[in-house]
Amino acid sequence: MEVLAMILAGGRGSRLDILSENRVKPSVPFAGKFRIIDFTLSNCSNSGIYDVALLTQYLPFSLNEHIGSGKPWDFDRRDSGIALLQPHEKPDGQVWYTGTADAVKQNIEYIKRKNPEYVIILSGDHIYKMNYNWMLEDHKKNNAELTIAVKTVPWEET
């Protein structure tokens, strides 16, 4: 099963206040050893998804530096790996992403060129552990057009 993971990692993260003043939210340190993005990247690697596109926009420098070649997640492969996709001027003159859906839309040519069987769109600023294969298997079993993974969380914990 050929899967392309598109990780949205370009948001400003204003609710983190000073922590994201000079870096994008997925690049914010976590537990002194990790960055928030590490959770999503580890989930991909642990699920056997090695074709990953990271869509960045706001202050991408520390995130790009942290990701590097993707070696810590085994993304430094010859025929797959990690691609850092920043917004760039298109023939229609559009440059910046205007939101998450627009970030994916502006990279549709990249998706077409990769021609994966499945595309998983993930957030780069969530902290969780998940095996994406379970979701993909359920998606295939139900012959679904779209699958969204959610978890109910009590209001007090949000």
Tell me what each language-model feature is.
Residues M1-T158:
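Unchanged
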